[in-house]
Amino acid sequence: MTTPANTTQAVGSTTSTTTTTAGATPANSGLFTIPDGDFFSTAKVVVASNAVATNEDLTKIQKIWKDMKIPSDTMAQAAWDLVRHCADVGSSAQTEMIGTGPYSNGVSRARLAAAIKEVCKLRQFCRKYAPVVWNWMLTNNSPPANWQAQGFKPEHKFAAFDFFDGVTNPAAITPKEGLIRPPFEAEMNAAQTATFVKITKARAQSNDFASLDAAVTRGRITGTTAAEAVISLPPP
């Protein structure tokens, strides 16, 4: 067993003790390396997020779409059209896509979405292009179609889509000019609130009873705790 070596040195009235361990790993070696300022200013970073489709995902989807005869020169526009459509109707796995976009060579949005789901979640794909759709909507003053149905105020209507959090995600694809404007804090709060309400309502539809005895369920098929939580939210 290796024992520490102690060195004691007296300087005037001050005594200092240095303890070293034989065979210790040097401080600047392998995983023990201590970074300096040059590293932080020159290091290369590849931003990735598990909430957003990866570049590898896009490569796979692109191959599938190419096999579906989506023209290469309008493939990006077909993706943007699909994601803009999802801003209107939603991007959950259960959402039914409507119609056919103008850039997909007659291939329906439903088929495009089905191909995406073979590789990643539709919402992950939508987040990848959220900044593109954000600029598109602002440029045309065209908010998501269902903003009123979702209970958004007029001043927050451009945040009324379920992949809004992708707008500021650094792993998303951002237009060359950048965002026309970043989302306002009030829009972020409205989007987060809408997400919370949707999740809570969805949980309220599930049966969380530990027993099917009528004394427990009182004849109800679903639980109500979550729904009641939404109704009785405390004031801000």
From Swiss-Prot:
InterPro entries in the record: Pltvir_coat
GO cellular component: helical viral capsid; ribonucleoprotein complex
Disulfide bonds: none
Lineage: superkingdom: Viruses
Annotated GO MF terms: structural molecule activity
Region (Disordered): 1-27
Ranges of Low complexity composition bias in the record: 7-27
Chief localization: virion
Compartments where located: Virion
Keyword terms: Capsid protein, Helical capsid protein, Ribonucleoprotein, Virion
Biological role: Required for genome encapsidation. Forms ribonucleoprotein complexes along with TGB1 helicase and viral RNA.
UniProt record similarity statement: Belongs to the potexvirus capsid protein family.
Protein name per its UniProtKB record: Coat protein
Organism: Potato virus X (strain HB) (PVX)
Lineage: Viruses, Riboviria, Orthornavirae, Kitrinoviricota, Alsuviricetes
